[in-house]
Design a protein with these regions (language model features):
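NAD(P)+-binding Rossmann beta1-loop-alpha1 motif at the extreme N-terminus of oxidoreductases
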Residues: 1-51
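Rossmann-fold dinucleotide-binding core
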Residues: 98-179
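Active-site-proximal catalytic alpha-helix in oxidoreductases
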Residues: 175-202, 206-219
Length: 289
């Protein structure tokens, strides 16, 4: 089993560690400083406050005939263009996106895309990965065939995740799942951009209340249009009263979980999150016309 991780950021590096330690033939595609760091030092990561190292193959160019069983990538359109002529059959996309999967398949060919989303977060500081998987009950690694069907390759992916001890879930409609995910993460990230002191945004009652209102609005619209939410627990944003939702949000932003899985990404990728904000709000605005 050969697996290529396209992109050596926090998420790619964490999955590379887990897959390599589980015994899979794992390669990372990297560029720039990260490429140099991995080539010179190996993949350094923190586990239980101890710095460890995994030696892993690193490449900065992919041959067309260099075939992998699965390719995981998160830098979407650049990656798809580079992977277009490669002969590997399975490309697992792990990105926040509102685009249709047909648009992706128009680049690499029909039947190669297996949409997914990671359940992880953390940071890389001084070339050392400090990251962890999201608790299963909050957000496991999520995936589905575009058709929603269970196939040989989804079963193969399940076995990989089980062997690597990566929590996972297979859903029926990945596009609906991603719409609901964006309906949640866009307001959560927006909160940090609405205050002068993002690290302590959980103490800002007005921002917390506005975030609760935005979440409630998003999921009201999503449910009206889709007639379902995925995962089912997203209904909590529709059902809970604003004061209770505000209280829960405040506690979440103040927590270690909030810092690791929400704050770090929102602060390090504001351009990405603001673009997703624009895309998501334009998308649901069309439903209201």
């Amino acid at each position: 089993m050969r697996i290529l991780i396209y992109g050596a950021g926090v998420i790619g590096s964490l999955y590379a560690v887990l897959l390599k330690e589980a015994g899979y033939d794992t390669t990372i595609y990297a560029r720039g400083h990260r490429l140099e760091a991995l080539q010179n030092q190996g993949l350094l990561y923190k586990k239980n406050n101890i710095i460890k190292k995994v030696d892993i193959k690193v490449i900065d160019y992919l041959q067309d005939n260099d075939i992998y069983d699965f390719i995981r990538e998160n830098q979407l359109y650049q990656a798809l263009k580079e992977l277009k002529s490669n002969k590997s059959k399975n490309i697992i996309t792990m990105v926040n996106s509102i685009d249709t999967y047909e648009k992706w398949e128009s680049i690499v060919g029909k039947g190669r895309i297996l949409p997914a989303f990671p359940g992880a977060g953390g940071s890389i500081t001084n070339d050392i990965l400090d990251a962890s998987l999201t608790p299963r009950f909050i957000q496991p690694t999520t995936f589905s065939e575009i058709t929603g069907k269970k196939t040989n390759r989804t079963q193969q992916l399940i076995q990989i995740f089980k062997h690597a001890r990566i929590p996972f879930q297979q859903v029926n409609d990945m596009h609906i799942w991603q719409l609901c995910h964006l309906g949640m993460v866009v307001p959560l990230a927006d909160a940090y951009y609405q205050t002068e002191y993002p690290e302590s945004v959980g103490q800002d009652k007005l921002v917390m209340k506005n975030t609760a209102k935005e979440l409630k609005y998003n999921f009201k619209i999503l449910y009206e249009k889709l007639h379902t939410l995925s995962p089912y627990k997203m209904h909590i944003f529709r059902i809970l009263p604003i004061p209770i939702l505000t209280y829960i949000l405040s506690k979440t932003y103040k927590s270690h979980f909030g810092y690791t899985f929400i704050y770090q990404h929102a602060i390090k990728a504001p351009d990405e999150m603001k673009e997703l904000h624009n895309q998501f709000n334009s998308y649901i605005k069309k439903w209201r016309l």
